[in-house]
């Protein structure tokens, strides 16, 4: 099963966010706030999916307070390149029940 999840280009099934995923979300929070012109008091990663490319894309559902959620895509380059995480996409005005999909 693990090998199926790691196929290049495929998106994994949604999983509960881990401390590592929360750390990834926290690192790109300033990028999202700059793009959306909003400040998020709460920024709690709930679930995530990953996609292996030349590096890894992380699709993360983030609870930002009340009934509000955002979906973000974070690119992590190959470890040996030692580059910072990059926010490459986002969707605002999402709900708890909105499916986390490729966008």
From Swiss-Prot:
As annotated in the record, motif Secondary area of contact runs over: 51-55
- Record keywords: Cytoplasm, Protease inhibitor, Thiol protease inhibitor
Intracellular or extracellular location(s) = Cytoplasm
Site positions (Reactive site): 10
Q: Which GO terms describe its cellular component?
A: cytosol
Q: Where is this region: Disordered?
A: 1-20
Question: What one GO molecular function would you report for this record?
Answer: cysteine-type endopeptidase inhibitor activity
Q: Which family does it belong to?
A: Belongs to the cystatin family.
What this chain does, per the entry, is described as: This is an intracellular thiol proteinase inhibitor.
| Identification of the protein by name | Cystatin-A5
Q: Which organism is it from?
A: Sus scrofa (Pig)
């Amino acid at each position: 099963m693990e090998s199926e999840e790691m196929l290049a280009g495929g998106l994994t099934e949604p999983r509960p966010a881990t401390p590592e995923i929360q750390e990834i979300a926290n690192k790109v929070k300033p990028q999202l706030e700059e793009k959306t012109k909003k400040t998020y008091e709460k920024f709690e990663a709930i679930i995530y999916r990953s996609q292996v490319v030349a590096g890894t894309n992380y699709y993360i559902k983030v609870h930002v307070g009340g009934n509000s959620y955002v979906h973000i895509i974070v690119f992590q380059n190959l470890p040996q390149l030692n580059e910072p995480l990059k926010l490459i996409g986002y969707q605002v005005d999402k709900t708890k029940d909105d499916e986390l999909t490729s966008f």
